[in-house]
Each structure stands twice: as structure tokens, then as C-alpha cells.
């Protein structure tokens, strides 16, 4: 791994020379590409520097422990060493995930669609819990979070929730969240304390960039309907036709948005979701053969594939694709998703190395 890091650090030095040349500003496209690469390489360098510093601290503490006679100091040193070992393991996993060769689509914004599945109202409540989890995770990463569409259930959960997340490395870390998420817990409505199993499905759709010239949607292929927005229970909450339903006739993809009071805003949001769904379908079709091998390695991202189980009574979360089990579900639900997302990226990297891709 150190050899690979050295290669990237050499590349960082080259990039810094290039972006310091005033002539680079005359080529905005090249400057933009180099700036993105520089940010990525700098993040990798910072992660590696933290590892080197912590390794030195560990070495010094171990040396001190070998000659320490005071029992209290021995205990303190041992505790510090154990804590730093855990931290070093986390940092190494983060570095491994950063060593995954950058994909041009890594920084694409994503649209996440969460839907209640098996379990009725309890599944809808878990959608709400996951919405909060991803919101907190996005905030911790400095990403922008936006509600695109939401359909509440009777107990204030969500039958469906669609959100947009934008920022650096969004797709890179969130792409493996697609699939079926199973929850095992005692529902609030359960009077006998029995554990119920429910499930929700999540789709992660990369949002086409403005530079994406391949995705062209002809206005003639769209059927746009407007109607009055309605709230829970079917009551009307708007007396104007602000809700929008867009149908893409060639593919049959249908998107409805009614959360905004403005028809124009609802149409804009619906179009964003529509484009992301069409792009996703095209990419799946185009890369079907190439992704067959990869899907066997890290999960297909198919919404029918069970990827993760959240067991609340055991405070356990298990990702079935890589056999990762953590006993800190409480922290995960508070947005501490890095141990899972970085492990998935790292796993993908090792699979790419193993298969020579």
C-alpha cells in the first residue's frame, strides 16, 4: 500500500507544479480537472500523514511502556496504545478507500429514493429513521441535502422519500447504499414486546451533470399532467394545480412531485428525478455485462437484494455483502456511516486489484 501511496504523492507534486503555472488559467477545462485531482490527492496525503503521525506516537508509547515501572502509568500507556490501535485501523481503512482510483462520476450528485416495503407502518417509520441518518451523514460530510419528494404515512413515517445530496465524493460513498435494508426491532405499536422484521428499499441514482451530453430528452417524449396537491388522507392542501406528473413515453418512467406550492418548482424537481432514473436505466443496460462480475463482488445495487440488517435489540448492524458486523447501531443511526461506506469502497478497490481491472 505504501508503494501505491508514494505514486500518488509523486503525482501530487506534479499537479501542484502544473496548477501553479499562470498559463493553466487560459484552459478552464484542464484547470478544473487538475483542481479536482489536486483536492483528491491532498485528501489522500492528509490521511497518510495522520497515519504516519499516529504510528510514531504508538512506537513512542510502546517504547515508554517497556521501561515504565509505575503501575498507574503502565495502565495509562496501555489504554492509550489500545485506543490508538483502534484509531489507526480506522485511518488505514479510510486510506484504503481513498486509494480506489477516482472515477469521473465520483463527484456526481445523487438522488436517493427510500421506499417502505415489508412491514407496513413500521417499515414507513424506519424510512424516516434512515432519512434522518443520511441527513446527519450528509451534514457531517459538508454535503448539501435537499428534499425532492415525500409521502407521509399515518404515524409520521414515510411511504416514500426522495432526497438530493450534492457535494464532493457523494456518489463514491453512497453508491453502495442501494438495495434492501432490513430492520429487526420492537415496534412502538407492539404491546407484547415482540421483535418484528421489516424492510425498506433504497435506490441511489447519480444525477446527470450539466456536461452530460449523452442524455437528451425530447420534449415531445414527455406527457406532463398538473393537478391539485393532496395531503395525508386525501384532503386537498392546495387550491391550485401545483402538483406535477411527468411521464417519459419511450420508457414509461413516471415521476410525481407535489411538495412545493409552485408548479414550476415541482416540475423542476420532477425533471431532475426523471433524468436521474432514465440515466440510471441506460447505464444499467449499457454496462450489464461488465457489471455482472462486479455485482457478484460488492452487490448489484438491485433493490431486491438484501444488503444490510439493523438489529436494534443487539445494537448491531451487519452488511451482508462484505460480512461486516458492527455493534454500534446507535452511532450509525446518528449518521456515523463512514465505517460502513469506506469499507465498501475499500472492498471494491481490493476486488479491482484482484481481478486486474
Curated annotation (Swiss-Prot):
Subcellular location: Cytoplasm
Spans annotated as Disordered: 285-305
An example Gene Ontology CC term for this record: cytoplasm
Modified positions (N5-methylglutamine) in chain numbering: 235
Stored Gene3D superfamilies: 3.30.160.20, 3.30.70.1660, 6.10.140.1950
The UniProt record lists the keyword Cytoplasm: yes
Keyword Cytoplasm in record: yes
InterPro entries, per database record: PCRF, Pep_chain_release_fac_I, Pep_chain_release_fac_I_sf, Prokaryotic/Mito_RF, RF-1
HAMAP family: Rel_fac_1
UniProt-recorded name of the protein: Peptide chain release factor 1
Organism of derivation: Chlamydia pneumoniae (Chlamydophila pneumoniae)
Lineage: Bacteria, Pseudomonadati, Chlamydiota, Chlamydiia, Chlamydiales
Amino acid at each position: 500500500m505504501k508503494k501505491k501511496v508514494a505514486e500518488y504523492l509523486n503525482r501530487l507534486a506534479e499537479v501542484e507544479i502544473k496548477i501553479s503555472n499562470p498559463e493553466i488559467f487560459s484552459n478552464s477545462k484542464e484547470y478544473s480537472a487538475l483542481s479536482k485531482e489536486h483536492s483528491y490527492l491532498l485528501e489522500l496525503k492528509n490521511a497518510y500523514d495522520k497515519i504516519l503521525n499516529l504510528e510514531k506516537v504508538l512506537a513512542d508509547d510502546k517504547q515508554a511502556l517497556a521501561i515504565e515501572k509505575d503501575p498507574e502509568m503502565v495502565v495509562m500507556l496501555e489504554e492509550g496504545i489500545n485506543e490508538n490501535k483502534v484509531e489507526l485501523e480506522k485511518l488505514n481503512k479510510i486510506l484504503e478507500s481513498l486509494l480506489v482510483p477516482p472515477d469521473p462520476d465520483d463527484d456526481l450528485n445523487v438522488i436517493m429514493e427510500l421506499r417502505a416495503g415489508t412491514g407496513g407502518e413500521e417499515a414507513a417509520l424506519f424510512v424516516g429513521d434512515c432519512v434522518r441518518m443520511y441527513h446527519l451523514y450528509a451534514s457531517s460530510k459538508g454535503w448539501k441535502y435537499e428534499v425532492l419528494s415525500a409521502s407521509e404515512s399515518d404515524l409520521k413515517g414515510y411511504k416514500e422519500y426522495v432526497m438530493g445530496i450534492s457535494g464532493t465524493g457523494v456518489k463514491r460513498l453512497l453508491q453502495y447504499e442501494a438495495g434492501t435494508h432490513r430492520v429487526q426491532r420492537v415496534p412502538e405499536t407492539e404491546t407484547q414486546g415482540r421483535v418484528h422484521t421489516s424492510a425498506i428499499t433504497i435506490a441511489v441514482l447519480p444525477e446527470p451533470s450539466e456536461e452530460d451530453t449523452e442524455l437528451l430528452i425530447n420534449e415531445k417524449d414527455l406527457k406532463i399532467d398538473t393537478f391539485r396537491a393532496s395531503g395525508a388522507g386525501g384532503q386537498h392542501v392546495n387550491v391550485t394545480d401545483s402538483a406535477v406528473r411527468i411521464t417519459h413515453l419511450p420508457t414509461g418512467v413516471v415521476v410525481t412531485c407535489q411538495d412545493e406550492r409552485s408548479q414550476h418548482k415541482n416540475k423542476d424537481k420532477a425533471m431532475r428525478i426523471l433524468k436521474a432514473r432514465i440515466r440510471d436505466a441506460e447505464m444499467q443496460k449499457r454496462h450489464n455485462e461488465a457489471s455482472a462480475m462486479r455485482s457478484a463482488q460488492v452487490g448489484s445495487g438491485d433493490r431486491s437484494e438484501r444488503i444490510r440488517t439493523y438489529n436494534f435489540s443487539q445494537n448491531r448492524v451487519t452488511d451482508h455483502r462484505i460480512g461486516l458486523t458492527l455493534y454500534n447501531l446507535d452511532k450509525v443511526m446518528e449518521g456515523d456511516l463512514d465505517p460502513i461506506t469506506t469499507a465498501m469502497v475499500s472492498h471494491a478497490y481490493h476486488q479491482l486489484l484482484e481481478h486486474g481491472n
